[in-house]
Regions:
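Hydrophobic N-terminal alpha-helices or hydrophobic patches in metabolic proteins across all domains
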Residues: 1-277
């Protein structure tokens, strides 16, 4: 049978992974619509990072072009369990189900197999949807203190843990800035990992030291952009809303995404050229 002609093993896992991803992101979108309204939320892509649709596209592009592979009995059993976790009215269940599903795909497929590639992206998704939140819950103080230390290096302000002391400023009602979990670089790092994994698997690039180094450089770039964003708030606290919530925040987010995409993309292009040569 031709590629993508029948519902095969890759299609099953692409469907399950996408279902879990949609269930995990839906509450975020619904909350943003309730907060901003449908029109404004839509313009803001419902507060969902573009790396998630990129990951979904990569998963389905990989599955669509895959040779037919029969679904195993254990695949159906795993699929049934995942499906139950996806539909139960517990928000965290859909996110948590990505962990065993991705682990199962990685464990039951060879490294060059389509199912392994989908599982690789699924594992990357768990970083943003599962492990990032757990890490912040368990190690919030040291993680946020690292962000604060980077900002201190850029601005020279006094720092106490995750608290930046900016002093009294004319027209500003606060003299301290607290870095919370939503402002942590960890969130951006997890999204860069998703972008890296999606592009690497979509273009079938071998995970070499050079490709990993490009991913680490992309992570460093997004950490720097996040630190610059917070540093701008320190320098111009009177423009907090613009920098932290408004167009300024969106523009800096775009800069971080473009930088990461450029770094990862150039690495993939070099790898493909070397493979052809």
């Amino acid at each position: 049978m031709g590629a993508g002609a029948t519902f095969s093993r890759p299609h099953l896992f692409a469907s399950l992974t996408t279902l879990l991803l949609l269930n995990a992101l839906a509450p975020m979108a619904i909350q943003d619509i309730a907060l901003r309204g449908l029109a404004v939320s839509g313009l803001n892509f419902f507060a969902i990072s573009v790396v998630f649709p990129i990951a979904a596209y990569a998963i389905w592009a990989i599955a669509h072009n895959a040779p037919a592979a029969p679904v195993r009995r254990t695949d159906w059993a795993v699929g049934a369990i995942v499906l139950v976790m996806a539909v139960v009215p517990i928000h965290l269940a859909a996110k948590a189900a990505l962990v065993p599903l991705s682990a199962y795909m990685l464990a039951t497929a060879k490294r060059d197999d389509v199912t392994f590639r989908i599982g690789f992206i699924g594992a990357a998704l768990t970083g943003a949807l599962v492990w990032g939140a757990l890490l912040l819950t368990a190690f919030a103080k040291p993680i946020l203190a690292i962000d604060a230390a980077i900002v201190q290096t850029l601005t020279g302000v006094a720092v106490d843990g995750n608290v930046l002391s900016i002093g009294q400023r004319p027209g500003v009602a606060f003299d301290k800035i607290i870095i919370l979990g939503a402002c942590s670089s960890l969130r951006n790092i997890s999204q860069v990992i998703i972008l890296w994994a999606s592009l690497v698997q979509l273009f079938e690039v071998r995970v070499t030291a050079r490709v990993v180094a490009a991913g680490l450089l992309a992570i460093a770039s997004t950490v720097l952009v996040n630190a610059i964003r917070i540093s701008l708030i320190v320098a111009y606290p009177q423009h907090l809303q613009f920098i932290h919530h408004g167009i300024g925040s969106s523009l800096l987010g775009l800069v971080a995404l473009v930088a990461a995409f450029a770094i990862i993309g150039s690495s993939i292009l070099r790898s493909k050229r070397h493979a052809v040569a």
